C-alpha cells in the first residue's frame, strides 16, 4: 500500500452539486494505483504535474504510471437526495442540510480516496459556498474569504492523521451554541430554532471529556468538538473526529424531555466521545476489529454515566440495554464471532449489531472484573499511548492489559472473541457437592457445541468463590451442608445459569442485577424448551410485588412479547401490581419502570387503555414520561388515524414525533396499513424511521396479517426503497428479522416466502427470521 501523507481538497458547491480539485501527497513505488471512487465524475488526473492515464473499473479509479510525490484529481460530485449515506441532503422544513456519513466505505462517494481505515492521512479542506451558509468540518475554521458571485470560501485547519471514514462536511444555516469555558471548545449545531434544546448535551459532553481525559490520561486532541443535529440520519450517531453527527433523538433533550430521552442522549454523547480516543486516535487496522471500536465505546459510555448520573444505575442499564439483547442474538445458530473476518467491505454493515456492541461491551466488563478495574484501566492507557495516531488490532489491547495485570488474558479473550455463542452453566447440587457443567446455549438444538473458558463467580452459603471452567464440567466439594448458591455474581459474566434447585438460588441474597439476570435466563430457557411454562410462570410469580425497576421492565417486556406473538395477556396480575407499586415513584428508575408498564398494559388491556386514554385531551400538559403510553391508549381505544397523523405532522421535535409513531403503529384498524406505507414511500415519515415503523407494525397482532400480506405482495417496492435510503441491504435485513412475527400463524408459508426472496446480502437475517419462527411455533405448543 502507498504511504498517504496528506489530502488537500477544494470543493465548490452550487446547490447540491460540487466541483472538486484534490491533491494527494504520497510515497509509492507502484506502477499502478487504485483509489476508491463511486458516483463521481472524474475530469482529469495529473501525476507530478503531468496528465496521466486513468480509467474507472467498478468502484475503483485506476491510475497508471509511477507517482513520485503528488497526484491531482479534478472531479465532480453530487449530494444525494435519495440516500442517507455518503454525501447527501437531509431534508427539513422545505430546506436541506448537506451532510456526510462515511463509515464504513462511503467516503469514496465524496472524493476519490484510499478508503481503508489503515491508510491514514492529514486532510486540508477548503469549501466554497453561497454567502449566508455555514460550513462545519473536523477542524476549526482557519479563515473565511470573500469571493466573487456572492460566495465565500471556508478554509479549515489541517487535521491530524486520520482515516477517511472519519472525515466530515456539513453545509447549512446552522444555529450554534457553545461552551468556551476551557479546551476543547464544545459547540452544538442544529437546524434553525432547535439549539436551545442542546444545553443538556453540551453539559454532558463537557463532563464526559473531563472524565475521559482523566481515565485515559491523554488530553482530547483537537481544539474543538462539534455535536451536530442531522435531520435525517441512518445511524444513531457517528464519531467523525471533532464533528460528531447525531439524529435528533440522540442529541436534543431539555426539561420537558422524558427520562428515557435524557438517558439516551447522555449515553450516545458519551459513546461517540469515547471514540475520539478509541477509534479515532487509535484506529482498527481492518474491519475485522470493528467490534473493538464499538464495544469499547459502549463499555466506556456506561462507565462515564455512572460517574455523571449515579441515580441512573448505569451498571444495571448495561445489563438491561446491552447484555440482554446480545445474549438473545448470540443464542441463534446464525450468530457470528465477535471478531468476524470481513473480506468484502460491503459485508461490514452486517457487523453493526448487538454482537459487536452489546456482547463486546459485556466481554470487556467480564475481563475488567477478572483482572481488576485499575489493572484494566492501566492496560488501556498503555495501549492508547503505544498506538496513538496509528492503527492496532485486538491482540494489541489484550497484550497491554495482560502486561498491566501481570497475568495473561489472551487465551481467555481468544475463546470469547473467536468462537460464536456462549454457554449455559448447569448447576447441580447433590449431598455436599456442586457440579458445574457447560454447553453452548442455543434456542434451537442445532447440535452445535463449544467448550468455553468461563470465569465463573459464585457465592455458596454467602461465601464468595471463583472457578475458571475450561472443560465440560467441574465439581466442588463442601465441608458443610448446602443452604444457598448463586452463580454469576453481579451478572458480570456473559453466560446463563440453569439451577436444578431454584430454591437454593432464591435462598441466597440475590441483588438487583442477579435478579435481572435470573429472570432473563429463565425466559430464554422457556424459549429454548429447557423448562416448561409452569416453571417460567413460577419464576415470574416470585416477582409480582418486586420494586426492582429493571426486573419489572424485563418481565413486562417478556409478557408483551407473548402478547405480540399470541394476542394473549398472560401477565395482567403482574402488570396491575406493578402499576400500583410504581405509580407514585419519585426516582428516575421508578418512573422508567412505570412508563414501561403502563405502555405495555395499554396495548394489552382495553379496559386499562380506556381509563388512560382520558388524559389524551390534556396531552400537551401531561408528564412526558407517560405521554407515549397515553398516545398508545388513545390509539387502542379510538382507532383515530387522522388525529394522530395531524399531531405527527404538527410536531417539530422528533422526540414527540416518535411517540406518535408508536401510537399509530398500535392502531387496531387494518385499513391503516396501506396508509402508513404510503406515508413511508412519499417520505412523509422520515426515511430514517422506516425500519422502526415497519417493525412496530409487524409487532401489532391486530393488524399483523395485513402487514405481512402487504410486505409479501410489495416486497420488491419495499426492497428498492429501503436499499436506496440506506445505501444497501442492511436496512432491509432488519425488516426481514421482524417478519419472524409473520410466521406465528403460518410458519411454512413465511419460510417459503423468505427463501424465495433471499439474496446473498440478507442471507443471515433471513436465517435468523426462520429460526425464530421455529422457536415461536414450538413455544405456541408449550403455552397454556
Curated annotation (Swiss-Prot):
UniProt-annotated catalytic positions: 272 (proton acceptor)
Positions contributing to Zn(2+) binding: 271, 275, 294
Annotated GO biological process: peptide catabolic process; proteolysis
Record's subcellular location: Cytoplasm
Gene Ontology MF, one: peptide binding
Site (Transition state stabilizer): 357
Gene3D superfamilies: 1.25.50.20, 2.60.40.1910, Neutral Protease Domain 2, tricorn interacting facor f3 domain
CDD domains (alphabetical): M1_APN-Q_like (cd09601)
Binding site for substrate: 103, 236-240
GO cellular component: cytoplasm; extracellular space; membrane
InterPro entries to which the protein is assigned, alphabetical: Aminopeptidase_N-like_N, Aminopeptidase_N-like_N_sf, ERAP1-like_C_dom, M1_APN-typ, Peptidase_M1, Peptidase_M1_aminopeptidases, Peptidase_M1_dom, Peptidase_M4/M1_CTD_sf
Cofactor-binding details, from the entry: Binds 1 zinc ion per subunit.
EC assignment: 3.4.11.-
Cofactor(s) the protein requires to work: Zn(2+)
Keywords, ordered alphabetically: Aminopeptidase, Cytoplasm, Hydrolase, Metal-binding, Metalloprotease, Protease, Zinc
Protein name: Probable aminopeptidase 1
Source organism (scientific name): Saccharolobus solfataricus (strain ATCC 35092 / DSM 1617 / JCM 11322 / P2) (Sulfolobus solfataricus)
